Amino acid sequence: MKELLIRNERCLGCRSCELACAVEHSQSRNLLGAISESPRPRYRVHVTSRGGDCLPLQCRNCEEAACLDACLSGALQRDERGIVVCDTALCVGCFMCVMVCPFGIITVAEPERRIVKCDRCPERAEPACVSACPTGALIYQEIDTAARERRSAVLERLKGTM
């Protein structure tokens, strides 16, 4: 299964991922149209910065997702890809999922009073945020491939110290 992985050392805090996400989830699916939409489209990835370090955060689709357990109406479900998705027609706006998310990533869209969370852009081969990232801080790949690449990188660094 593919996961959205973060290489935080590469994030510049440019927020290209946020913009691409909002445009992808807009009605027009283009920047000019998205800017003029009302209400404005919401992004689902959040670039957080502190002390010069930046980190793009989005739903981690936790194995034991507290939001799924907290959802009173059954609006939150795990789809066939393993992604936690929201059926807005079932959502009653209790926002229990917002309160229990350990990452603070599920947010509320006003004035619709519905939740907004990353859905991994199901119509795309890779999420819009990944495609938009100019530094490769966000990658979408199989966990095994990512682990193998990290091990190779560690080996290369170790070779340089010997």
Model-identified regions with their sequence ranges:
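N-terminal beta-strand motif that seeds the catalytic metal site of vicinal oxygen chelate
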Residues: M1-E9
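Ordered, amphipathic secondary-structure segments that act as subunit-interaction surfaces
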Residues: N61-I83
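Flanking helices and flexible, charged tails adjoining ferredoxin-like Fe-S electron-transfer domains
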Residues: M1, Q27-D69, A89-M162
